[in-house]
């Protein structure tokens, strides 16, 4: 959600902070700000509503000197988007400037307590309460900043990632986290700080991921010091990250989202590299090899996820049940964690998250672990909280996803779920060798089939203009195509702001058919499958009510082509692999409609890439 950046060292902090905020724009935000310790030890704070570019204009001609600072992009949780509510927030005496990601649940109680002691507040945010609390504790006890932060955080209930600078101690930054990500970049006599590693790849590939309850003390030229709230040292070794600048640039595309749609063939190849042997048509997953006993004795799989990852989980359910004959439940993590679910020690919980930082999914993991379940994580970001909280798992290896609307992460998640189901099905003996090799062989061919679909982008761009002013959409699919329909509807909602709903095609008669008329576009995934004839009947019913049909069909299907207003043809593949190919035209359709409507495709309103608060 919010993005934090910090720097302390010998370089000028301002350009590093601004560049870092731009790297974090993909997380979503409504305002931005920065605090700089100037060369004359003045604490200068600049804020603006809008984009990072607006912050740059605000600071034009101002004193942006200094080699120490923190910065922030805010996504409003407490208080509307405004300059006053933007971070950094300052203490009563103006000595401290703090940036914060998360939610302080008991902020109202703390605020009342501070007001009774004479503190006054300028904003309506929980963050200002936190910095005022730290400042009050520091002033009352004449304490150093670290001790004041430790004492203040003991009173806090909620989630936080914070970075604090102190005018009286201009040679340090104090950073802390609980249930919200924070990464320290380690350079030569300098430190970088950010919500994820993307802002620091220009300067260092050595990072330390802070764990819950840890506080980092960053001083230029000094070793990194990490302690807990009780001042007990927490040893860490820096990890080497493999990000490169090219992965964080558009590469000639007008938007990151379009680039990431077109990246998918290569991403899926990367996801399979080292795991799929195309010569022997076999799959090797180290997580399955190393934890075979725990996975094979599972009486049930429970998939927990949110948003797009939940849709991937629905496909995973069908794959695992079909290949492994093990029952699978798919749960919204936000519902699962609060409904007192029945969890058995022989359950395997699969947690799916692109960022690896989704707050509700992390909470669901902790609940399942507390009841003895084995946890398998599927995420994209190496070293993320979910990757560290699970017993084992698989990275999707699709590279940084900058567009807020997920594309390549979705197909990466589906690919890993396919590999997991194949590996387990073979180990269990529930998938015949012939079928196993046939599916793997087809899976190897998927990237090239994706490229074939992408060649139709001009056609999809052309007819998407016909739906620029549509107010509603219905998406339909059956079997493996139903989650694809859900994901297609979500993509359209996210970036074009058109209301869209996905349904199983058979459920059309149970309500949605009442909405169909000449003004209602219907997107239907109708590739060849055992249910093809039934889906064909659905299309005929839609056309009988003058509905406009966009059909995703298998190459050579002339029957539906003659019925539909527009049809997008896909290369033939196995039904279980159709989602990998069929999702691409729906991503392109959503993208081009949003572009026609003049929307901010990469940073749609009110959305955050990484939902790190509940």
Spans of model-derived segments:
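Conserved short alpha-helical segments that host acidic/polar catalytic motifs at enzyme active sites
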Residues: 1-250, 254-255, 266-300, 338, ...
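Glycine-rich phosphate-binding loops that contact phosphosugars or nucleotide phosphates
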Residues: 293-445, 527-566, 570, 589
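Glycine-rich, anion-gripping cofactor-binding loops and their flanking helix/strand elements
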Residues: 183-208, 334-368, 507-543, 573-587, ...
């Amino acid at each position: 959600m919010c993005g934090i950046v910090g720097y302390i060292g010998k370089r000028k902090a301002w350009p590093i902070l601004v560049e870092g905020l731009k790297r974090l724009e993909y997380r979503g935000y409504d305002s931005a700000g920065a605090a700089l310790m100037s060369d004359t030890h003045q604490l200068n704070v600049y804020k603006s509503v809008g984009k990072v570019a607006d912050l740059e204009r605000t600071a034009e001609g101002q004193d942006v000197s200094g080699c120490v600072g923190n910065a922030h992009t805010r996504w409003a949780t407490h208080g509307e988007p405004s300059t006053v509510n933007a971070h950094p927030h300052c203490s009563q005496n103006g000595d401290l400037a703090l940036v914060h990601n998360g939610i302080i649940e008991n902020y109202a109680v703390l605020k009342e307590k501070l007001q009774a002691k004479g503190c006054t507040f300028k904003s309506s945010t929980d963050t200002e309460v936190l910095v005022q609390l730290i400042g009050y504790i520091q002033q009352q006890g004449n304490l150093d900043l670290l001790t004041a932060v430790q004492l203040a955080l003991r009173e806090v209930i909620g989630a936080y990632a914070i970075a604090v600078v102190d005018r009286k101690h201009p040679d340090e930054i104090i950073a802390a986290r609980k249930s919200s990500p924070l990464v320290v970049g380690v350079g030569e006599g300098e430190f970088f700080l950010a919500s994820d590693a993307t802002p620091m790849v220009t300067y260092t590939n050595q990072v330390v991921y802070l764990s819950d309850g840890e506080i980092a003390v960053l001083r230029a030229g000094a070793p990194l010091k990490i302690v807990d709230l009780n001042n007990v040292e927490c040893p860490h070794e820096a990890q080497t990250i493999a990000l490169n600048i090219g992965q964080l640039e558009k590469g000639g595309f007008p938007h990151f989202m379009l680039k990431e749609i077109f990246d998918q063939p290569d991403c899926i190849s990367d996801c399979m590299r080292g795991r799929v042997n195309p010569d022997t048509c076999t799959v090797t997953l180290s997580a399955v090899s190393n934890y075979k006993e725990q996975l094979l004795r599972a009486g049930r799989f429970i998939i927990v996820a949110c948003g797009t990852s939940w849709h991937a989980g629905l496909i995973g359910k069908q794959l695992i049940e079909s290949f492994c004959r093990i029952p699978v439940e798919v749960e919204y993590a936000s519902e699962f964690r609060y409904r007192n679910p029945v969890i058995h020690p022989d359950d395997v919980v699969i947690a799916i998250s692109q960022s690896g930082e989704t707050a509700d999914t992390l909470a669901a993991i902790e609940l399942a672990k507390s009841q003895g379940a084995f946890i398998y994580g599927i995420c994209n970001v190496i070293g993320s909280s979910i990757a560290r909280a699970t017993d084992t798992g698989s990275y999707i290896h699709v590279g940084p996803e900058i567009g807020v609307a997920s594309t390549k992460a979705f197909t990466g998640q589906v690919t890993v779920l396919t590999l997991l189901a194949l590996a387990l099905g073979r180990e269990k003996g529930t998938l015949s060798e012939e079928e196993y090799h046939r599916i793997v062989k087809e899976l190897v061919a998927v990237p090239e089939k994706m490229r074939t679909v992408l060649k139709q982008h001009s056609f999809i761009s052309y007819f998407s203009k016909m739906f620029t002013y549509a107010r509603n959409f219905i998406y339909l699919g059956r079997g493996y195509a139903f989650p694809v329909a859900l994901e297609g509807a979500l993509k359209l909602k996210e970036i074009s702001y058109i209301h869209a709903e996905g349904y199983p095609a058979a459920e059309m008669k149970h309500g949605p058919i009442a909405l169909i008329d000449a003004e209602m576009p219907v997107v239907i995934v109708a590739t060849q499958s055992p249910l093809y004839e039934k889906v064909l009947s659905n299309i005929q019913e839609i056309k009988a009510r003058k509905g406009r049909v966009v059909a995703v069909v298998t190459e050579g299907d002339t029957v539906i082509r003659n019925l539909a207003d527009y049809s997008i043809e896909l290369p033939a593949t196995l039904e279980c692999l159709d989602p990998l190919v069929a999702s691409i035209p729906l991503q392109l359709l959503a993208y081009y409609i949003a572009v026609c409507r003049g929307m901010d495709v990469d940073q749609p309103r009110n959305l955050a890439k990484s939902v790190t608060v509940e």
